[in-house]
Amino acid sequence: MSATQPDNANKSPAHNSLVRDAGAPPAGLRVDGVALVRGGRLVQNALSLAMVAGEVTLLRGPNGSGKSTLLRTIAGRLPAAAGTIECDVPVLYIGHADGLSPALTGRQNLADWAMLNGLVDDDAAIDAALDRMQARPFADLPVRRLSHGQRRRVALARLTLGPSSALWLLDE
C-alpha cells in the first residue's frame, strides 16, 4: 500500500490540540508507526503518514493490503494494534456502504444525520448540501430507488453538512 501526496506533505505535522495559536502548523493528520490487524492477520506494520489541511491523498495497493482497515482505524471504528494516530480536526467517514437508510428519502437521511450530530437543522442548509453534490433532483426519492452513484452523492452531501475543517475519509 502506498500513499500519494504532494512533496511538501510531511513538512507540517498534525498536533493533538484542537486549539492552535496563529503560528501553529496547519490542521491535519499524523499516523505514526501504526500496525493494522484484520481477521487476526497483520496487514500493515509500522505505517506512517502525515497530511495537512486541504490535501487530497490517495491510498492505493492490492486487495487485502489494509487500505480500508487504515481508514476505519483513522475514523476510530477499529483499534490500531500499535502506534499512534493524531488528528486535530473532526473526522467524517464513508465506507463501502453509504450508511443511508433505504426507506427514507435522501433529504430525510441528511436531516436525520444533521440532527443526530447536532448540526444544522434547516431546509436551506440541506438544499445547499444537496446542490453541492448535484443531488437535489433525486433528493425526495426513497434511497432504495437510487442508483449506486446517486446514493454516493447523497452520502457526500451529508458530509458537507459537517464542519468545513473536517477530514473526509472516503473508501471506494
Where are these regions (language model features)?
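Conserved ABC ATPase signature
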Residues: 142-146
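Helix-to-loop junction immediately C-terminal to a conserved catalytic motif
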Residues: 75
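ABC ATPase nucleotide-binding domain "signature motif"
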Residues: 135, 147-153
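The feature captures the beta-strand-to-loop junction immediately N-terminal to the Walker
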Residues: 60-62
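Conserved ABC ATPase "signature" region
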Residues: 123-138
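ABC ATPase nucleotide-binding domain "signature" region
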Residues: 58, 151-160
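Conserved structural motif at the start of ABC-family nucleotide-binding domains
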Residues: 29, 44-46
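Q-loop/switch helix immediately C-terminal to the Walker
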Residues: 97, 102-118, 125
